[in-house]
């Protein structure tokens, strides 16, 4: 009986190692975008239906449309756009910032981010969980890392358009923009006022700008 008790955890661990990652047992797991996405990502396409185009994404050479309220555009090459990264723990995106452009405070719940500036000047930073801010003005060629789940931002700090590329440690890093979470939905004004100490008039103004109600 003691021997059987010892064998069971060993077998269980062995089973977990075999089943924990498609990448551990096959070369790749191209996402089957026709299937639903689960907590572990998309299921794999059958190898016979995989094409070279599944491993190629051509959208990062095209400037995004910055004619919007934040004067910024993000072109993602996440698993939904680039099925070849499924299961590999990587993805990338292009960031265009017009003069005065800003990516408001946001988080990526599923991944850390590395930002490299390709053109212009970008003021970027994040706030640690102890509320310490870390800010830096980045020039062409500079790189900054944003740890997973922490609030961070990017602002065009120059007098010309800025361009950057961001890589992520997940095929689907997720995104939540703080301003949108507060003011671009039907979260009641009184609740926001109680939890942020903003006055109702300011909240309604921000809801009006961002398309929220209540």
From Swiss-Prot:
Function: Probable receptor for the plant growth-promoting hormone auxin.
One Gene Ontology cellular component annotation held by this UniProt entry: apoplast
Ranges for domain Cupin type-1: 58-204
Family: Belongs to the germin family.
The protein's name in its UniProt record: Auxin-binding protein ABP20
Superkingdom of the organism of origin: Eukaryota
Phylogenetic classification of the source organism: Eukaryota, Viridiplantae, Streptophyta, Embryophyta, Tracheophyta
GO biological process: auxin-activated signaling pathway
Naturally occurring in which organism (per UniProt): Prunus persica (Peach)
Disulfide bridge map: 29-44
Gene Ontology molecular function: any one: manganese ion binding
Signal sequence, start to end: 1-23
Subcellular location: Secreted, Extracellular space, Apoplast; Secreted, Cell wall
